[in-house]
């Protein structure tokens, strides 16, 4: 909800501001939307996460023990726990940075697969694997710790090295991951949220450029 709501707000703000109103450049639209999102949440880590780990150091003789106690005693979200325990900013940091995992990695893979004629389902799986490989997923960290995150990354790398959904070997390997992750209790919810953002931006940018071209044709004909 956070990521999608933010990107929708960013897209709306971009449209109203008309910063990209005259452009049918798909990449410019996507980067503009990401920048708007970053502007909306600028400073969110400092506002929401940093206060969680501020404490009177004179009262903390064992920082690690104190941190673990804080994580256990407070009603924190998975993202908040990960920041307190590992210093990972999670989705807040991703948004603050303009969704680089989406813009620079998942979206190019999704777009490339679609251009190859692959189905949306297969292209989305490949994009998800790319996200598994690079995202510090706080849901995984909360449930499986750093070992769980490392395992998911290793399996994603193995799947992509086999071609992902582009090749039979990769497809077979991906099929086995479903049961494997379920058995281990690993559910990369953060990556799933970023996949939704990836798909949204791909669809929105296609719609945007199509509409801009149509508007341009209408103006020429008139």
Predicted regions and their residues:
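Phosphate-rich cofactor/ligand-interacting catalytic cores and adjacent structured alpha/beta frameworks
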Residues: 2-179, 183, 202-222
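Active-site proximal loops enriched in glycine and acidic residues that flank catalytic Cys/His/Asp
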Residues: 199
């Amino acid at each position: 909800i956070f990521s999608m709501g933010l990107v929708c707000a960013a897209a709306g703000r971009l449209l109203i501001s008309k910063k990209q109103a005259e452009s049918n450049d798909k990449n410019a639209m996507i980067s503009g939307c990401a920048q708007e999102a970053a502007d909306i949440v600028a400073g969110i880590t400092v506002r929401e996460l940093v206060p969680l780990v501020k404490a009177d150091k004179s009262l903390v003789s064992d920082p690690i023990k104190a941190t673990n106690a804080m994580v256990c005693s407070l009603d924190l979200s998975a993202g908040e726990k990960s920041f307190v325990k590992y210093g990972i900013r999670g989705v807040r940091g991703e948004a603050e940075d303009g969704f680089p995992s989406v813009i620079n990695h998942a979206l190019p893979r999704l777009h490339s697969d679609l251009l190859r004629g692959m189905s949306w389902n297969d292209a989305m799986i490949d994009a998800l694997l790319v996200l598994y490989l690079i995202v510090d997923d706080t849901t995984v960290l909360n449930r499986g710790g750093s070992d769980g995150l490392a395992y998911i990354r290793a399996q994603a790398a193995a799947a992509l090295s086999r071609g992902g959904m582009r090749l039979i070997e990769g497809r077979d390997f991906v099929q086995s991951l479903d049961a494997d992750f379920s058995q281990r209790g690993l559910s990369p919810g953060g990556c799933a949220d970023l996949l939704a953002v990836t798909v949204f931006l791909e669809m929105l940018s296609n719609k945007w450029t199509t509409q801009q071209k149509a508007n341009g044709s209408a103006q020429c004909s008139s």
